[in-house]
Amino acid sequence: MAPIKRGDRFPTTDDVYYIPPEGGEPGPLELSKFVKTKKFVVVSVPGAFTPPCTEQHLPGYIKNLPRILSKGVDFVLVISQNDPFVLKGWKKELGAADAKKLVFVSDPNLKLTKKLGSTIDLSAIGLGTRSGRLALIVNRSGIVEYAAIENGGEVDVSTAQKIIAKL
């Protein structure tokens, strides 16, 4: 599938999971409930605890979350194929456990990732097929206003600073 681009409708699937900010067990995140009513940023990463994601990509979003939200964004969605428990632990490790507007979402079967056209094959280094690195701005009508798709494992066009400049 071709990568998502500006002007495309953000896809939905019933096969993504999260642990609610108030805690509890993992459950499905019903994307269709907010895709047409909320403005949000999507950040897709290849894997929790991987050095580029942990040291370069996500820290900028955590540090700049108040600034991003001040631009009219309702929340930031972080997508990875890791399970919800791993993502909860990673969020805590990143110092963002209390950031309720930063929602870590598990896409275990890559259904959303495939609809975004953003898979990356890391089989050569033992990681299999993963979510590719990207960042999107989605408006309150569910339309992608900005799409930044990284080339391979780079961390450049999808950084928080680049997204803030587009908000």
Curated annotation (Swiss-Prot):
Chemical reaction(s) catalysed: a hydroperoxide + [thioredoxin]-dithiol = an alcohol + [thioredoxin]-disulfide + H2O
GO terms of molecular function: thioredoxin peroxidase activity
Keyword DNA repair: no
Membrane topology according to the record: Peripheral membrane protein
Induction: By methanol.
Group of enzyme by EC: oxidoreductase
Motif (Microbody targeting signal): 165-167
Keyword Oxidoreductase: yes
Annotated InterPro entries: PRX5-like, Redoxin, Thioredoxin-like_sf, Thioredoxin_domain
Active site: C53
Domain Thioredoxin: 4-167
GO process annotations (BP): cell redox homeostasis; cellular response to oxidative stress; hydrogen peroxide catabolic process; methanol metabolic process
Enzyme Commission code(s) on record: 1.11.1.24
Location in or out of the cell: Peroxisome membrane
Keywords: Allergen, Antioxidant, Membrane, Methanol utilization, Oxidoreductase, Peroxidase, Peroxisome, Redox-active center
GO annotation, cellular component aspect: mitochondrion; peroxisomal membrane
UniProt main location, coarse: membrane
Additional comment: The active site is a conserved redox-active cysteine residue, the peroxidatic cysteine (C(P)), which makes the nucleophilic attack on the peroxide substrate. The peroxide oxidizes the C(P)-SH to cysteine sulfenic acid (C(P)-SOH), which then reacts with another cysteine residue, the resolving cysteine (C(R)), to form a disulfide bridge. The disulfide is subsequently reduced by an appropriate electron donor to complete the catalytic cycle. In this 1-Cys peroxiredoxin, no C(R) is present and C(P) instead forms a disulfide with a cysteine from another protein or with a small thiol molecule.
Function: Thiol-specific peroxidase that catalyzes the reduction of hydrogen peroxide and organic hydroperoxides to water and alcohols, respectively. Plays a role in cell protection against oxidative stress by detoxifying peroxides and as sensor of hydrogen peroxide-mediated signaling events.
Protein family membership: Belongs to the peroxiredoxin family. Prx5 subfamily.
UniProt protein name: Putative peroxiredoxin-A
Originating species: Candida boidinii
Gene label: PMPA
